[in-house]
Amino acid sequence: MSALIDKINETLAVIKKKTNKNYEVGIILGTGLGGLVKDISIEHEIDYSDLPHFPLSTVESHQGKLIFGMIGGKNVVAMQGRFHFYEGYTMQQITYPVRVMKFLGVKTLLVSNACGGMNPIYQRGDIMLMIDHINLLGDNPLIGKNEDEFGPRFPDMSEPYNLELIKLAEQVALENKVKVQKGVYVAVPGPNLETKAEYRFLRAIGADVVGMSTIPENIVANHMGMRVLGLSIITDEC
């Protein structure tokens, strides 16, 4: 058994003291979006500091809790606060919670982020459904020995965000008269914001919005066979 699986089992042992349920949906709440946890019927919550091998979020707006509860009759586990490359964590540390979620039964992962809008038709406050991404973080969580129990050595990333979930999200948005965009997210390391020349470059290579997260978690979720839906909240017009 690998050291990573040993670590996951140690984390699961703490979680199982609180709950033995199977959680089919995982949620990662991004910067400024932790308040969405109010829509979850909370049954249990565990501070990251109480979970073995979990990193600790250093971002002020991230609460640093793993939330267990229900939404719409579904058992969900939600991260109230995520980890970023610019905080000094490795890609493996950033994505460790996604590995744990898979062992809790998660088959569908909803990831959210706050981002800068570069597409000129996007406005502050718009929601963008992520249809693809560009990884400019300069690293990848799958580098190193592959764990065959998790997934293949060379996972297919031709559809990183599940088309069925995107269509479902569009339908829900239409029914609720919520305007949504669809586009490509590019991740950069940060923590500094981009220069004007960098914004022009990112637009030229096909990105609609820019942020500093989400892609590592998406790669690991795809590696483990999860369906992923990505939501970007445009907080600035770049």
Regions found by a protein language model. Give the residues of each.
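Metabolite-binding pocket within alpha/beta catalytic cores that recognizes anionic/polar moieties
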Residues: 2-157
